[in-house]
Amino acid sequence: LDDSSPDTWDSEALRPFWDAIYKMNLPIYFTLIGGRGSKIYERSWMDSYLAEQKVLLGWLNRYPGLNVVVTHGLPWTAYLENGQINFPEEIWDIFKSPNCHLQILIPIQMGARWEYPWKESEPIIKKAVERIGANRIIWGTDMPMVARFCTYKQALDQFRVHCDFLSDAERKDIVGGTASRVMGITN
């Protein structure tokens, strides 16, 4: 599909591709940006993002059992109000699917606004853990792009050292355990 196509990535034209992925039981990583090409500007980023989540929810219902990861986190900056991230309730709907995971990498979106260790992000990270579960959250680096805001170690230490509300088991899930399970990697 190109930007001029009215079809979305879940269209009938792509059904054979998705059916093959489903048969192979491969994990899928989706980056939701709230539209493609000129469609991005047809409505607000917030509305477009939620609409794209609904497309993903339909896809998840069509292909149950596949592990899916929403990459790059949620649209943190779109919902930033007075220094706090305030998501609407419906942003959590796709995570009602037990196989939908969330990759979190705060520095790439918020590094220009907040300083390490990004304490301002902790309330929304805590909420994500409460709503989704650490066993469905994956730490992401976005290296080398994130290096303009922090080191690799700092990005990792956000979850290894900071976020005091996390248990040791939750930390292990977020910084590797969840990704290992999604990818089918066993020790």
Where are the model-predicted features located?
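Short Gly/Pro-enriched loop/turn and capping motifs at secondary-structure junctions
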Residues: 108-109, 143-146
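Residue-level detector of flexible, active-site-proximal loop/helix-junction positions
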Residues: 75-77, 144, 181
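Generic preference for well-ordered secondary structure
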Residues: 54, 86, 121-123, 143, ...
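Catalytic pocket-lining loop regions of alpha/beta-barrel enzymes
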Residues: 4-138
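Mid-to-C-terminal alpha-helical segments outside catalytic/metal-binding sites
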Residues: 126-127, 131-138, 147-187
